[in-house]
């Protein structure tokens, strides 16, 4: 597996990431096999979002690989634009994923300058 530095974060991530959206389409046992096979092959970048199946993608990842938490970079997303909702999403995401931290949190589906301004403003999601 080939790896790259993740910006200035100090994280080293595999060139092949694993997106969790389609975990919604498969049973838990198959998700466990798929995720563990990806990690066994040297992959270490798992991405999901609270909006994927109302947290079901996160829950499948949490049930499947959290015993291997030190082996991968964990990324999730929130579509919240305000601090309160983003903080609630983060807390729920951590419960779903069965972990105490994310390595990266992405703001999901930011499509306008106005949305970005809201996220970055006082009381915006960035403060969460």
Predicted segments with their positions:
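N-terminal binding-site loop/beta-alpha segment at the start of enzyme catalytic domains
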Residues: 1-71
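Glycine/proline-rich, positively charged
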Residues: 26-29, 81-128
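Short alpha-helical scaffold segments that flank and stabilize functional sites
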Residues: 34, 40-41, 60, 67, ...
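Active-site beta-loop-alpha junctions enriched in small/polar residues
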Residues: 21, 49-51, 77-81, 107-110
